[in-house]
């Protein structure tokens, strides 16, 4: 039937390749339950007996890498959390389930010792000046059980000396009774003193800016973009349906410095499928807190099942973000329009990436992802005989390879024009200039998995049998009356664009090899092995 037997073999390999072939994130550490590095066995036994340490009550939520240390935060949502800011010595523990070491020491993790310690930390950030930024929420408990023994305080540590070099309490005017801050972004300008931190007030619906040089903070709160979308409060994770309808501004990322000397802050409310943005020129100016409404820009929705809590952008403009409904990590290259065909999925795993709570890119452009099954922990019961918490890593270049986010080898690139910036309510402008790309490839390169050894830590999903595949539906762009394209949002990247369902490549190569008689000749079907985000191409008769 087929004259080219080699083509048949390649197609069969694509269809029946084992599930590990789709994975690029590699598991580095994992735990059934968290363990801590007590000074000695006797003190650990005392903590277990007194309830100061309850292994089943710990949930990791934040991760950050610096040198030979991998930092992990454990909020004090329940009793029995001996330390909230911890790290793994990566020289001593290359893999496995290492004990978490309190940072910088045990005393600095004493709950309620406001001036000297950290009570609860969530997501943290290391800047390029070797400083670790930690916001202590000062809280114990979660939801209705929350108490506030300490005020919100910014803590900054010098990672070369492991000493705290700054503690700044947020003034009462910068918070409100509903304030809950779980995310931080750090903006370094001309030098290490020209530093700002931005804090997302998820339940108080505000954005707080802090100046290192001035040692002062101010709050932006008069903006509806910080609020949840009332239509996007329904969640489905790990088979659990729940409603987080009050969750406002949450995930944030910062662009590289623009030509005007400022960055762009991108952010999303948790109960939303939409991304927003604002220049740090506005956020750095205390006088603009009540007079900046029109300086914030709305991008369109990402599409269904696209809630996100964490995002990060590399210094060359590649944004990674978690997709908690999809057990996946997505990507977008910020030099491209913010539209669905320029969003990709770099990895998906319905076992290992259940609630990928935090995503980071370190100084060496390695990506770190922490998954923790948070909704199961909060709303149901974890099985502590199973692996519940994982930390994955991979080089950024490896993750985006052969995705729409990899512009170095992208046969599915956009038209070589950039539009005049417009708000979403205005028509798309004419081309401003021609954007230069590398020559378009005649055909998307095929990836051969046959010679790749399976990663030993990613073998828990069974392989497909026969030629069974899972299909992915690709949403089309929205059009208005008479086929006119809906105006797209623009934000500091010289493009109009929307964000819809994360999807695979949106265009086919213009040049196709000759096909046997009776075949269509085009690349007709995107298929997805083991529900991963990596696209495998096949010809169908």
Swiss-Prot record:
Pfam family, one: MRJP
Chief location bin: secreted
One Gene Ontology term from the biological process aspect of the record: regulation of adult chitin-containing cuticle pigmentation
Lineage start: Eukaryota, Metazoa, Ecdysozoa, Arthropoda, Hexapoda
Glycosylation sites: 144
Task of the protein: Controls the pigmentation pattern of the adult cuticle and larval mouth parts.
Top-level division of the source organism's lineage: Eukaryota
Keywords: Developmental protein, Glycoprotein, Secreted, Signal
GO CC, alphabetical: cell hair; cytoplasm; extracellular region
Family: Belongs to the major royal jelly protein family.
Protein name as annotated: Protein yellow
InterPro entries per the UniProt record, alphabetical: 6-blade_b-propeller_TolB-like, Royal_jelly/protein_yellow
Range of residues in the leader sequence: 1-21
Subcellular location: Secreted
